């Protein structure tokens, strides 16, 4: 760890680093042993692709812990320091530094339980039938964004770039450059569209140029697992001054489609202790038919986009909030949304039906988003199939 970061932690986070002069294997037995020496017992531990986290207890008091590699730790701490005084977040209590990673202990959030407390849980609970008046909860979350987005600056560099510009080479080009079927013309519900490769080329060209964008202080990864309905926010690796268009495209994709269908299906480990979401996957499975003509190099897809009334209500409130603040969102919104559709998961590795569903969504949004972005998005989501 750099001396600058160490000094920043002592000054801004106000915790002392406890240093271990060896590498942590990040295996369950060793993690339990390390935390036991510090007086903690593990209540549960969750191993994910990019991180390990869980809940521990000491003297009948719970804490949330994360184990992060050195660069991820640096991003998390920097983001946390940037928003901790203006956003509702849980305080960091202790940090253990190893040669290859760090363990961060956060105060435990008592409003989060099994299948309760997160925006994800609220949406899942109301997906099938709105059981209570949800407006108060939705407005509570949206009003926080409204207050945050009132103060803006224009920037061309921002933390959320790692989800957009930084994934052009590492994901968009790497994953799809050799996909022959993406060079086929696409017809969706009887309407001619472009080749998927042509849309991808537009996305690459857009992010190849520098754009000064309207930015506001934000958590930076607004998916439904990172937002508590209290409200409270988690995960700070991309927190800081981010473009509102980035925040909007991320939460639009997360709320309406990804966290209802794709994410629980292709990254189920994220939903540890929030597993009710799995019961609704079939509900959001599209009624999709497709035909690939290799001779004419054409793809015909007939489909709908499934979501729920509560998810549409949330996004409509979000759009209304942006309009009331006079936030300018242009047609380039589709390029940010395309990066969410194509670069969270490699769609080429999905089941075939989901592969073509992803292509359908991309083309449907591309064809229907107009210069009046807010109006066209409201029209688009009003045509989604409510299940």
Residue ranges and their predicted role:
Residues 50-77:
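ATP-binding glycine-rich loop module of kinase domains
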Residues 104-113:
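Short pocket-lining segment of the protein kinase catalytic domain that shapes the ATP-binding cleft
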Residues 2-43:
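Juxta-kinase regulatory segment immediately upstream of eukaryotic protein kinase catalytic domains
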Residues 23-36, 154-217:
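An alpha-helical support segment within catalytic cores of ATP-dependent transferases
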Residues 115-165, 199-211, 218:
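Conserved kinase catalytic-core helix
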Residues 84-99:
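Conserved HxN/HPN-centered segment at the entrance to the catalytic loop
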Residues 245-322, 338-353:
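Active-site activation/catalytic loop segments of kinase-like enzymes and analogous catalytic loops
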